Amino acid sequence: PDWDMMKSIVEVHHPGIDRDLLKRSLDLFYQVRELDLRKRPSTSELIDWINVLVHEGAMVDSSTIPFVGSLLKNEEDLEKLK
């Protein structure tokens, strides 16, 4: 799905999500999907990752990916982002 459709999907699963968190997490999700990965993160992994971010009160910025293990499932992919 494109950015706007993904935003709508996330809002169904996380009604009332902080707008800044939503934008930053979607932007970072699509940046990660552009990388040369063995398994690009899917919609369900995005939903799971945002769930962790919300529950942990984590901040998202472009310099780090908190709880990246919730977003990427392949060990080689995780190593690429370290």
Task: Give the ranges of each region predicted by the language model.
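C-terminal regulatory/interaction module of P-loop NTP-utilizing enzymes
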Residues: 1-82
